[in-house]
Amino acid sequence: MRFHSLILAVLVLLGTQGFAQIPLLSPSPPLARRSVSPNPSAVQRPSVSKETEAERKARFQELTAVLKDRIAEASDKVMSKIIDQEKDLRMRLSYFEKQDRLDPNTFATKEEIQNWQKLVDQFQASRDKTAKVYGDASENLEAALLEEKIAPALATAIRKEIISTFPWDDIVKKNDLLTTYVGYHRQLLSLFDQNWQTWNSAKPYFADQKTEADYEKLCQQITSAGKEIDTLYKKDNF
């Protein structure tokens, strides 16, 4: 998901909805800002009778430039958390997508199975943390916009506009798929643990028909869920 390209569109949209008639920035500027800052003469609104059309346009353009910079600052604070957490989740997902994870012969000891069960728990925790950063995104974005001294009414409007661009249906679907995917791997590891060293070196791994059927079903479910998750990642560029 890329949001910097949306900032100008947001500004244009807000400008067409009457926000040009309300303050864009809060009265008191932040103590420390990036290099872009409005000239005092541009921020202070001259009387309408004395302000020429060119001056009004220049003032609005300068305020818009400052606002664009501050929206970028605020959105970066929120998006960096989401991006970092998505990276952690993708890394953990990649471990479990390897075909070796479906082969019982890759486990030399029962302790290795237990270690992977711990990794499954960490995978689930990463999924849960990712869901939380998305869930907190709206509140965190508005707080970040207010910290950038954007006027409250405008901050709320910008927050709503940006948050509406999130692919929420796919985010929820991905969260559900990941929980299901983790559950399948948990079941597979339990199957290996319960049938320790009863498998063959090549397929079919299990002589017991029910165990083999359970194994094959889990492998198919893991593969299918994994493909759906990858499709969503490619579609939405998480």
Regions found by a protein language model. Name each.
Residues T198-F238:
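A cross-kingdom marker for long, charged
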Residues L102-A202:
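Extended amphipathic alpha-helical interaction segments
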Residues I71, S75, M79-I82, E86, ...:
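A structural signal for well-ordered alpha-helices, especially hydrophobic packing surfaces
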Residues G18-A20:
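Boundary at the C-terminal end of the N-terminal hydrophobic targeting segment
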Residues I7-G15:
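Bacterial N-terminal signal peptides
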Residues E55, E62, V66, P104, ...:
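Primarily heptad-repeat coiled-coil rod domains in cytosolic scaffolding/tethering proteins
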Residues I22-E112:
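Leu/Val/Ala/Ile-rich N-terminal alpha-helices, chiefly Sec-type signal peptides and the beginnings
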Residues M1-S5:
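Positively charged n-region of N-terminal signal peptides that target proteins for export
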